[in-house]
Amino acid sequence: MNPADLEQLMARAKEAQARMAELQRELALRRVEGSAGGGMVKVVATGELRILQIEIEPSLLAAGDRAMLQDLTAAAVNAALANAQKLVQEELQRASANLAVPNLADLFGAGERS
């Protein structure tokens, strides 16, 4: 490998590193929502896969069905996290396309799962 190629490779690596740090900051600010029970339970998550908020319809609490509340909450959390993972995957694919490097989503384990 000639020195110019190595220099270019290092420059791309630095650019990719800077873009990933920027993307991480952006994802921390992005919000996605998941819901269950026709919107009776809503969950807000970040692009960092952190749960920020859970909203439960008062009528669901008044019903007193603990098992249903637990199921709907779990479903809404899972939906929010799935939406956050999709957001991360899309942003990583976009970043890797802009940098002309292999799919970064696969490198970070956020690629599609079977």
Give the predicted meaning of each segment.
Residues 13, 49, 73:
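Residue-level signature of catalytic and energy-coupling elements of molecular machines
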Residues 72, 76-87:
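Stable alpha-helical structural segments in soluble proteins, enriched in small hydrophobic residues
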Residues 1-28, 33, 83-114:
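Long amphipathic alpha-helical segments used for membrane anchoring, targeting, substrate engagement
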Residues 50-69:
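A short interface-forming secondary-structure element
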Residues 6, 56, 77-78:
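A broad detector of the eukaryotic-type serine/threonine protein kinase catalytic domain
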